[in-house]
Amino acid sequence: MMTFNDLPEDLVVEILSRVPAVFLARLRSTSKRWNTLIKDGKLSKKHSSNAPRHSMALVLIDHKVYSVRSNLRGIHNSVAPYVNITCHFSLKEHLSNNYSTEVDIGHVFHCDGLLLCTTKDYRLVVWNPLSGETRWIQPRFCYKKDDCYALGRSSCNKYKILRQGRLINPSEERYVYNIVGEDLVINNSQERYEYEIYDFNSNSWRSIGVITGLFNPNITSGVSVNGITYWFDISEQFLLSFDFSTERFGSESLPEGDSHLALSVTRQGKRLCMLSTNYTYVTGTNVNLWIATKTSENTRAMSWSKFPILRGGVGLRYRCHFREGVSFFAYQVKEKIVVVSCHRPNRHSKDIIHIVENDKFIELDHHGAKPTHELSPTPRLLIYVPSLVQIQHGI
């Protein structure tokens, strides 16, 4: 009897090209043949055209990346939800003679199947956790602790990296403002930052301008949607964007009256969403989810739809979970919105995963990896859309 291993390779590629990438990840460890096929460029091209997009959640805990499996389907029928932190994606050290040495990750940024990782010792690497492919990015001069990075994609599907680096020496300033849109409000900070673009094809960095700092290095919740990257600006009053096609910054207004906490994307990574809080004397602190709906062609203003998540006030025990550093993703379950949020453990709770829905706050004692102590880095939860996309290699 013919087995799957006996099939011609072209037929196997055709079959696998229709399997969601999230399931292909499980095949990598089953045999060398599967692992080689998953890394193959021919399968990658077919897969991007044929396979449906399925998302999964990842979480960064104690410098390691894990997948998050959740079951929220029965939450409206009094069935207890659960979250498991399961598969550990291992980023290997390329400088070590021992390839089993694992790298500690300080920060991750997702764009269309690739993770841009800043290591604990400030190095930079682009990583596809699904295929295991990596590309270590060398700095123009040296790695710096204060550098911030974002990964994006141009309209011709070329990946680029944006770097924000603080200038120590005022003589380095060149005051180039051509990367700023006319509607962008420049803050009054005296600090100057240089912005550079890394081009994968030429394997090199180039400066695109020096202006006042636009996005706060302490706010690491930037997200990429359709190749454009968004952050809160340093004053947290505007939404800052960077278009990797035009290599220009822009800004969007944010809903008034709320304190803006974190950005995320919808399940398929196609729409921007935001978690915020507002306070009134009568109700106390309330939590809202905002989803970007469209951009006006005339004013280029972004429209938002508001979904109240937690009304009637957040108690003191839970208020600390909705501060800077929180990360989240949102699900739609039976026409209702459920938010899964993540924060560091604190004196009120050792749990880091929480569910907010229908004015209820649910703490989950999840299974799997957990921060080792209260001083561990803040866990980071993000939506990841697996892909077999290959990292562009330059000359």
Swiss-Prot record:
Q: Which InterPro entries match?
A: F-box-assoc_dom_typ1 (IPR006527), F-box-assoc_interact_dom (IPR017451), F-box-like_dom_sf (IPR036047), F-box_dom (IPR001810), SCF_F-box_component (IPR050796)
Q: Which domain of life is it from?
A: Eukaryota
Could you tell me which SUPFAM superfamilies the record lists for this protein? F-box domain
Q: Which SMART domains match?
A: FBOX (SM00256)
Q: Where in this chain does the record put each F-box domain?
A: 1-47
PANTHER family listed in its UniProt record: BNACNNG10540D PROTEIN (PTHR31672), F-BOX PROTEIN CPR30-LIKE (PTHR31672:SF13)
Name used for this protein in its record:
Putative F-box protein At3g21170
- Higher taxonomy: Eukaryota, Viridiplantae, Streptophyta, Embryophyta, Tracheophyta
